[in-house]
Amino acid sequence: MYLLVFKLFLFLSLLQISVSARNLASQEPNQFQLLKYHKGALLSGKISVNLIWYGKFKPSQRAIISDFITSLTHTSPTSKTLHQPSVATWWKTTEKYYKLATPSKNSSPLSLTLGKQIIDESCSLGKSLTDKKIQTLASKGDQRNAINVVLTSADVTVTGFGMSRCGTHGHARGLGKRGSKFAYIWVGNSETQCPGQCAWPFHAPVYGPQSPPLVAPNNDVGLDGMVINLASLLAGTATNPFGNGYYQGPQNAPLEAASACPGVYGKGAYPGYAGDLLVDTTTGGSFNAYGANGRKFLLPALYDPTTSACSTMV
């Protein structure tokens, strides 16, 4: 399992805060952040993202996540009608990892599409989940050419949620002796349990500099926070699906494409300040990427391996 480390927990002291913020905000190359390629397989080709809804979610909440997944490869018939910066443009940063890993090969680029949606409102495995139960839920989705995403509702507890992680990504082997490995993700709705850890900057942080929380672009602190964490974990899954791709640090708690840029969403970011963002003039919601169906999302900066810097959309 690979942890999505709390953004503010990564700043272990005021000294570390100031050094990290200066390098990230100025976009200067920082060798400490360089993600090493460990020669393992990366996801490629057409991959379905299957959503496994565990607990009660409103249809409007499910639409936020499904629209985000659709937005990853969403293109408009004409470039003039495609709002920029877009979610699809944000995702293209991950392609740079593939080109560096296989410079002489013509491997199929990764293309993510929204797959099946499985709804388990009755919480068939109970409302207190362990990692093993998360893996069991993830196995309900397709196990070939798929990423299975388990999304837990606000009243479901998961080991470590709100204490050491906001979500995880990992891999498991499918059923049968010759079952192939498949990738999975878990993200929880932190709205009532730990919004200060997992829904910043839409909620005041538990630790660190305090500033007024931003307005969530889809008017749902929990779900907009889930989008941030899901986006980070999807980037990590694409570039380090089986624990031997691009990462830095310990294999079971690595820095990856998004977690290498903690707390950065726009230019000028520093601890307690997400960066200079776009603001919806009607709702007041802060965002940095346009998505499908008129959506607006706030997405984390991604580490750009070609520049050794954190790349932001705005």
From Swiss-Prot:
Task: Give the knockout phenotype.
Answer: Reduced leaf size, root length and biomass production due to diminished expansion of epidermis and parenchyma cells.
Coiled coil residues, start to end: none
Tissue spec? Expressed in root tips, vascular tissue of roots, shoot apex, rosette leaves and embryos.
- Secreted recorded as keyword: yes
A biological process (GO) of this protein is: response to brassinosteroid
Q: Which residues form the signal peptide?
A: 1-21
Which compartment or compartments is the protein found in? Secreted; Secreted, Extracellular space; Secreted, Extracellular space, Apoplast
Question: What Pfam families would the database entry show?
Answer: Phi_1
- What cellular-component terms does GO give this entry? apoplast; Golgi apparatus; plant-type cell wall
Q: Which UniProt keywords apply?
A: Apoplast, Secreted, Signal
Query: Which function does this protein serve?
Result: Required for cell expansion in leaves. May mediate brassinosteroid (BR)-induced leaf growth. May play a role in the control of BR responses in roots. May be involved in signaling processes that coordinate BR responses with environmental or developmental signals.
Identification of the protein by name: Protein EXORDIUM
| Natural source organism | Arabidopsis thaliana
The coding gene here is EXO
